[in-house]
Amino acid sequence: IENGELVHKAGYGLANMELGIPLDGSHVHRMASVSKQFTAMAVHLLAEEGKIDLDEDVRVYLPELLEYEGTVTINSMLGHVSGMADYDQIDGDSTERNPGLNIQSAAGGPFRLGNEDYLSIEEFYDVVKQVPLKRLPNQQYEYSNLAYFLLSMLVEEVSGQSLRRY
């Protein structure tokens, strides 16, 4: 991309080795945890702009979250010490859209991104914001995709833009 215009789009190698399908510029790939660096950068930009305080309780910016036992700071979320669980540690939540949806696994369990169980960002946020802490904040390191998802919601709330646009 140069000056906002796509100047090169290509793929190299194979999209499917078994079938010999070449990779081209139209294939979509899951970024997984690579996106965390963009979320963290956006959070730090907001702090640099004076719009958030990294040592403040996240509920100052996302008041609809549960009232946690202990203060969950933005810094604790960035450093994976917030006490928040991860996708596979959420007990049987469901949504009105799909009352049978049981979010227990992001890979191969009942909750699978991108298929018929797909939740919109808003629907997923409605589930995640009701998840209690697994443990008190700042007690133990535990990798948490949920914390980073909530940080992306914080960026959108505070900036008034999508994470991508911000």
Regions found by a protein language model. Give the residues of each.
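Well-ordered alpha-helical scaffold segments within catalytic/enzyme domains
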Residues: 152-157
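Short hydrophobic alpha-helical segments used for membrane anchoring or interfacial signaling
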Residues: 1-3
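Active-site-proximal loop and beta-strand segments within enzyme catalytic domains
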Residues: 8, 12-144, 159-161
